[in-house]
Amino acid sequence: MSELSDAEKRRILKERRQKKFGSGGGTNRLNKITGQADSLMSTESTLDQRERTPEAAINTRQNEAGNNQSTTDNNPQVSLLKQLAEQDRQEGSEAPPDLMSMLQSMTGGDAKNGTPPTLGTPPAPVDQSMLDYHNYLVNRLKAWSIIIKWIVLLPYMYVVTHDVPLSLPFGLMDSSNFFSVLMGFEIVATSIYYKRLQSIEKGTSVNTMMHGSMIAKLISLIPDQAPQQKNLKSRLFTLLQYWDVVSMLITDICFVLVVLGIFTHI
């Protein structure tokens, strides 16, 4: 058998030492060298602690996390912040307000307290049954006003166009005064119509223009923070009211002209 070389001897010696230290021999040898075999102080080798180090580190981190959690729970400021965050999440989960409520809050109205809508502000939500009843009353008023107008105008136009001998005061039978009489009658009829319409709106608490006109709803969207904007909205609503009256007058005049043309050929 050939002799071992120096490199092989060193390798074998190194393996033996590692095996000896791995079985706890490192601690015994350290105690013998330092003379602390019977000492109360720990002389355990770092090689022997290598296996237990990860477990000890994990336990240390768990203890620190538990201490931090208990400190957080005992802190009143942290508890208050948690409560506020929970309230924000609950409020965020609620249904968003409808469009009319948002517009009411933008223009200073109060739909919850039942503040009646004013001209230039978005109308508060109205019960659909009440709105249907209001529309029924308004449509009936329009129908009756048209019927009464033509019950008066049709005979008068026939008498004027056919020279029927009637003695009426103030020159009512004179054809030259026809349009003056017509305009006076329209003014009286329109005044009665709007007077009756106001009484209906007062009884149902529904604004006919704000709920029935798309143009009025668009005008109410204009913000009124500045005086110029308020003045603009007021003028637009005034023009819209005048246009309602003028449109009724134009409609009646058109029908009068058609009927006059028919009567002149009869």
From Swiss-Prot:
Q: What Gene Ontology cellular component terms go with this record?
A: endoplasmic reticulum membrane; GET complex; Golgi membrane
Record Pfam families: GET2
Cell location: Endoplasmic reticulum membrane; Golgi apparatus membrane
Question: What InterPro entries has UniProt attached to this entry?
Answer: GET2, Get2/sif1
Q: Name the predominant localization.
A: endoplasmic reticulum
Which stretches are Cytoplasmic in the membrane topology?
Answer: 1-140, 198-244
Chain ranges on the Lumenal side, renumbered to this chain? 161-177, 266
Origin: domain of life: Eukaryota
The annotated regions of Basic residues compositional bias extend over 11-20
Q: Where is the region Disordered?
A: 1-54, 86-123
Indicate, by first and last residue, each region the UniProt record lists as having compositional bias (Basic and acidic residues): 1-10
Question: Which residue stretches does the UniProt record annotate as biased composition, category Polar residues?
Answer: 28-46
Picking any one GO biological process from the record gives: protein insertion into ER membrane
Its transmembrane ranges are 141-160, 178-197, 245-265
Q: What keywords is this UniProt entry annotated with? A: Endoplasmic reticulum, ER-Golgi transport, Golgi apparatus, Membrane, Transmembrane, Transmembrane helix, Transport
Q: How does it sit in the membrane?
A: Multi-pass membrane protein
Self-association state and partner proteins as the record states: Component of the Golgi to ER traffic (GET) complex, which is composed of GET1, GET2 and GET3. Within the complex, GET1 and GET2 form a heterotetramer which is stabilized by phosphatidylinositol binding and which binds to the GET3 homodimer.
Entry function? Required for the post-translational delivery of tail-anchored (TA) proteins to the endoplasmic reticulum. Together with GET1, acts as a membrane receptor for soluble GET3, which recognizes and selectively binds the transmembrane domain of TA proteins in the cytosol. The GET complex cooperates with the HDEL receptor ERD2 to mediate the ATP-dependent retrieval of resident ER proteins that contain a C-terminal H-D-E-L retention signal from the Golgi to the ER.
Family classification: Belongs to the GET2 family.
Q: Which PANTHER family match?
A: GOLGI TO ER TRAFFIC PROTEIN 2 (PTHR28263:SF1)
Q: What is this protein called?
A: Golgi to ER traffic protein 2
Classification from the root reads: Eukaryota, Fungi, Dikarya, Ascomycota, Saccharomycotina
